[in-house]
């Protein structure tokens, strides 16, 4: 049986994550307040940020930047998009 959470990103009830996707208190907060759908949206944006900005995830500054963008996207109603990204035309 799937968990239902009141997703703060989508502002509605939705299926929750199966486990905390990130370590520590932030991971617990995401698990409690973010839906699978919103987390999948974040993962797509994260991939674009890494690719477009050529981030090296071995660099602590790059990881900190991604964490800040993740918190902004998931909890602060911030729109996060990679500069220079052009969505594919339909």
From Swiss-Prot:
Q: List the disulfide bonds.
A: none
InterPro entries attached to this UniProt entry: Fe_traffick_prot_YggX, Fe_traffick_prot_YggX_sf
| Superkingdom field | Bacteria
BP term (GO), one: cellular response to oxidative stress
**Keyword Iron found:** yes
GO molecular-function term, one example from the UniProt record: iron ion binding
Looking at the keywords, is Iron present? yes
Which Pfam families does the UniProt record give? Iron_traffic (PF04362)
What's in the GO CC field?
cytosol
Coiled-coil portions: none
Keywords, ordered alphabetically: Iron
Family as reported in the entry's similarity comment: Belongs to the Fe(2+)-trafficking protein family.
For this protein, the record's HAMAP family field holds: Fe_traffic_YggX (MF_00686)
Q: Outline what the protein does.
A: Could be a mediator in iron transactions between iron acquisition and iron-requiring processes, such as synthesis and/or repair of Fe-S clusters in biosynthetic enzymes.
- The protein depicted here goes by the name Probable Fe(2+)-trafficking protein
């Amino acid at each position: 049986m799937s968990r239902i959470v009141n997703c703060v990103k989508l502002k509605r009830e939705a299926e929750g994550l199966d486990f905390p996707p990130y370590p520590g208190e932030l991971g617990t907060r995401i698990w409690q307040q973010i839906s699978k759908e919103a987390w999948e949206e974040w993962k797509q944006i994260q991939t674009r940020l890494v690719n477009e900005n050529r981030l090296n995830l071995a660099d602590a500054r790059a990881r900190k930047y991604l964490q800040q963008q993740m918190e902004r996207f998931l909890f602060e109603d911030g729109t996060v998009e990679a500069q220079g990204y052009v969505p594919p035309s339909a």
